[in-house]
Amino acid sequence: MPFIHIKSLPFEQQRDISRILQRITEDFSNASGIEKQHITVTWNLLSAGHYAVAGEVCDDQPESGHPLLVEMLLPDFNSSEEIAEYIQAVADSLSRHAQVPINNLFINCRLARSGQVFDAGEMVHW
């Protein structure tokens, strides 16, 4: 189930987003022990001028000041320690493979509760 959703402005120097998504999936699988088939990673590019921080907009993804926005969705049975490890694994992987400074990432984790997830045609309980 883990979902990792990444948003950024377009990069001035093109990145191989498909390859980065594969690497993040592999790194997260290795860090969490979760099989790759259960991990979903997406990357949405924001339109130039559609991301403001302190009222300042940018056309391209800067090295600082407009962090990449990452939202993780995990089942609520993970411990606080596991969640912290997973967040760090995503930060390390994204920074390394996308060549983005780790201090220019904002990662938020939300927890999905048993009975509040619909997948593969049915409600999921754990």
Model-derived segments and their meaning:
Residues 1-126:
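Interaction-mediating elements
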